[in-house]
């Protein structure tokens, strides 16, 4: 068996009566402890650190310390022949014994030291007492003869640190009840500790030594951390653990993707499928195996397994968010609320800028009487009808862009609102500008035509427009009220809006402006129910719009003149059926 021996300095002669009993202490029968090392890990051989790592720079005197540990891979017992302690340890014990003596001051402590061995009759192995110094009480055996050297004080002693401490180990089911444990204490050269102890023999223990973590490396024994816990094997991850595996195919996975721990391959497959809205078909029974080797065989089953394990489609960024990691779609801009005065002023300005001035009206084509012609419309009349409609569309578009808050809407919503309300705005603006009593129709480009000049192109629709113009002008609506009414025609809920909430907010602002303006503009006779009468014109406009669509449809069937693309698009988009 290997023998590990460490000796520091020379044996110094202690001052006092303790000198007489040094041979007894050096006796090989000083202590015999029987301990069973049932754990193969404890019985394994190990290398312990040299005492020079602890005692560098020490200038005091030392005693000898020798111990032997068997190096057998089999379970063995450590007996007195295999574990022998010779001599004393660095420092002196006598200075501390006065502190640990009982209050009774037993005379037994004054007797010389003689520890019986297992071969002596006075030795009782099962009832081994406790041995402590400055940190506990020491009771060797019931025979206290020759123990006086424990009570003798040594003068001019040098207190040193404890290099090994023995304590009661925590119970471990994998280890023997009394394994050996050697714990290195902190080795510091810049301070000296007083009242240090050397050994503490545990009570209720046949051996008195706690567990030795012999499986630890020498570097661990050199550390300043006391190895107070019993040896326990390090936890290792079981091969069957699913941690770090892809939940879809079982490949290696380092982190979570879309809510589930998946590999990079399944992450990319799931992302591409969701972004492209791909549809897969299983050629088998929709139960194809999906693993690392066969995950590319059936895309349908692979995607279904992605959904089953919990991958979330909503987390995948869409095409509009590519390259914008960590950024969410910006919140839609709310319509900036302005004061009613500012809003109504902007509406009036937009209306005035979109109508021809009285000094620029074009009467070159105006004729009160026309020669008798056939009731059948001609291509010239139809072309004139289309030109008036398409010319009004561009004027109305420019007018709508000047409405405060309209340009803040999405471009798609602007086009949808304009095309849906075009015919209604054409009728309303024509009815407000015209002079129905004189039979004059003033169009937005400044052209003035008589009613008889428009009958063959507009048909009966023109009569309905003139009748509506009569009823509208009898209400004596001022320009601010009419400007608000025109804005309400285009700013209203339509099917297919992307942001109907913003349209609704702008509509509410316009209605509030109209409510605040009407009481100050109308006289007392016209003030009651004026707002309801004014808003009641909106359903009439819807009816007139339907008649206009019917007229366009009729002219398309006649096929005398093909309609302009913009008129044809508006017709097809605004059909109620």
Swiss-Prot record:
It holds the Pfam family Hormone_recep. GO terms for biological process: cellular response to corticotropin-releasing hormone stimulus; detection of lipopolysaccharide; inflammatory response; non-canonical inflammasome complex assembly; positive regulation of transcription by RNA polymerase II; regulation of transcription by RNA polymerase II. Residues 500-523 are annotated as: May bind lipopolysaccharide. Residues 243-318 bind DNA. Residues 247-333 are annotated as: Required for binding NBRE-containing DNA. GO terms for molecular function: DNA-binding transcription factor activity, RNA polymerase II-specific; double-stranded DNA binding; lipopolysaccharide binding; nuclear glucocorticoid receptor binding; nuclear receptor activity; RNA polymerase II cis-regulatory region sequence-specific DNA binding; zinc ion binding. Residues 563-574 are annotated as: AF-2. CDD domains: NR_DBD_NGFI-B, NR_LBD_NGFI-B. Binds 2 zinc ions. One of its GO terms (cellular component) is chromatin. Its cofactor is Zn(2+). Keywords: Cytoplasm, DNA-binding, Inflammatory response, Metal-binding, Nucleus, Receptor, Transcription, Transcription regulation, Zinc, Zinc-finger. The keyword Ribosomal protein does not apply. Orphan nuclear receptor. Binds the NGFI-B response element (NBRE) 5'-AAAAGGTCA-3'. Belongs to the nuclear hormone receptor family. NR4 subfamily. The NR LBD domain may bind the lipid A moiety of lipopolysaccharide (LPS) in the cytosol. This is Nuclear receptor subfamily 4 group A member 1. It comes from Xenopus laevis. The lineage of its organism: Eukaryota, Metazoa, Chordata, Craniata, Vertebrata.
